[in-house]
């Protein structure tokens, strides 16, 4: 099930979708599981057990792939990651106890001073999802809570506040390019934020049959922003397949191996163990590593 070619040293990035809950309703969000019961984030003992299991994952991959992963960066994603301060604080405590590095992806809308301090003092990296800075586009995408559309100025302010506490933190911007924002120019926003990385994804057909774009349209978006080529990491659909280690809210590995049939899942990690669960999904270690190359904008 796995690709066995040897790859270079790298920290292992594990994406844990801690919850499906979100205050936005983006139409092409891929973090949808039908509101499952039993999210591990709700239970302290389950969080602890999952952290133990994740700590052992580099050894599993090193054995299976003749790789040399040395540590784990636990990337917290949602849903929206920063909805419940108490629960995130518990995850931070458990992760740090085991020496795991932390990062997260957020829409930024609910980040208050408590979260700013927690992030700045405990996270190596924080990524903000920004697909558009245009109100009507964000409304069409679903980046809206009640009547409040995503506010780019709040994100700029939040990033400045986090950097003021921890100037060394890595700031990322994640952008999904779809039919709704393919013609937009985000240069002013990116120029203000000056992130360390700008990850640009082509919308996945696994979650949306509408709003899809062609390879040419995706390339045009990249070329429009080529002055940021040094920080852009672009991913088309092929590069995203089997190249992420993802855990769903109830503790199963899942993979987007086949765009036409949704996701493939392992059995729950806490039931069958990390080695067995990981064996039940596809993972391409070379693709994982090559995702970190910079996009070629020539």
Curated annotation (Swiss-Prot):
Q: Per the UniProt entry, what are the Gene Ontology biological process annotations, in alphabetical order? A: defense response to virus
| Radical SAM core domain ranges (all copies) | 8-235
Q: Gene3D superfamilies of this UniProt entry?
A: Aldolase class I (3.20.20.70)
- Required co-factors: [4Fe-4S] cluster
Q: What class of enzyme is it?
A: lyase
Q: Where does [4Fe-4S] cluster bind?
A: 22, 26, 29
Q: Which reaction does it catalyse?
A: CTP + AH2 + S-adenosyl-L-methionine = 3'-deoxy-3',4'-didehydro-CTP + 5'-deoxyadenosine + L-methionine + A + H2O + H(+); UTP + AH2 + S-adenosyl-L-methionine = 3'-deoxy-3',4'-didehydro-UTP + 5'-deoxyadenosine + L-methionine + A + H2O + H(+)
Note whether Lyase occurs among the keywords. Answer: yes
Q: Which UniProt keywords apply?
A: 4Fe-4S, Antiviral defense, Iron, Iron-sulfur, Lyase, Metal-binding, S-adenosyl-L-methionine
CDD domains linked? Radical_SAM
Checking InterPro entries in the record gives: Aldolase_TIM, RSAD2/Viperin_antiviral, rSAM
Family classification: Belongs to the radical SAM superfamily. Viperin family.
Describe the function of this protein: Expression of pVip8 in E.coli (strain MG1655) confers resistance to phages lambda, P1, SECphi8 and T7. Prevents culture collapse upon infection with T7. Catalyzes the conversion of cytidine triphosphate (CTP) to 3'-deoxy-3',4'-didehydro-CTP (ddhCTP) and uridine triphosphate (UTP) to 3'-deoxy-3',4'-didehydro-UTP (ddhUTP), probably via a SAM-dependent radical mechanism. The modified nucleotides repress transcription from T7 RNA polymerase-directed genes (possibly by acting as chain terminators), strongly suggesting these nucleotides block viral polymerase transcription.
Alphabetical list of PANTHER family matching this protein: RADICAL S-ADENOSYL METHIONINE DOMAIN-CONTAINING PROTEIN 2 (PTHR21339), S-ADENOSYLMETHIONINE-DEPENDENT NUCLEOTIDE DEHYDRATASE RSAD2 (PTHR21339:SF0)
What remark does the entry add?
Answer: How this protein allows bacteria to resist viruses that do not encode their own RNA polymerase (such as lambda, P1) is unknown.
* NCBIfam families linked: viperin_w_prok
What is the recorded name of this protein?
S-adenosylmethionine-dependent nucleotide dehydratase
């Amino acid at each position: 099930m796995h690709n066995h070619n040897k790859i270079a040293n790298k920290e292992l990035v594990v994406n844990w979708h801690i919850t499906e809950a979100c205050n936005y309703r983006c139409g092409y969000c891929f973090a949808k599981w039908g509101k499952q019961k039993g999210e591990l984030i709700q239970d302290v003992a389950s969080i602890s057990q999952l952290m133990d299991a994740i700590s052992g994952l580099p050894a599993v991959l090193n054995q299976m792939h003749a790789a040399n992963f040395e540590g784990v960066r636990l990337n917290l994603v949602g849903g929206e990651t920063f909805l419940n301060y108490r629960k995130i604080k518990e995850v931070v405590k458990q992760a740090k106890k085991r020496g795991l590095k932390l990062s997260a992806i957020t829409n930024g809308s609910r980040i208050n001073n408590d979260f700013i301090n927690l992030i700045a003092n405990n996270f190596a990296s924080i990524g903000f999802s920004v697909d558009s800075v245009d109100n009507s586009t964000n409304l069409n995408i679903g980046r809206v809570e009640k009547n409040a559309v995503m506010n780019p100025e709040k994100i700029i302010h939040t990033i400045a506040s986090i950097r003021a506490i921890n100037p060394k933190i890595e700031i990322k911007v994640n952008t999904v390019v779809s039919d709704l924002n393919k013609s937009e120019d985000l240069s002013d926003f990116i120029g203000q934020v000056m992130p360390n990385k700008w990850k640009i994804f082509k919308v996945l057909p696994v979650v949306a049959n509408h709003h899809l774009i062609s390879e040419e349209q995706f390339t045009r978006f990249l070329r429009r922003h080529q002055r940021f080529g040094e920080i852009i990491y672009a991913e088309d659909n092929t590069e995203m397949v089997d190249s992420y280690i993802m855990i769903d809210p109830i503790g199963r590995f899942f993979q987007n191996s086949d765009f036409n049939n949704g996701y493939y899942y392992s059995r729950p990690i806490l039931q069958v163990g990390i080695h067995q669960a990981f064996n039940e999904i596809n993972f391409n270690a070379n693709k994982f590593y090559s995702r970190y190359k910079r996009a070629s904008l020539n």
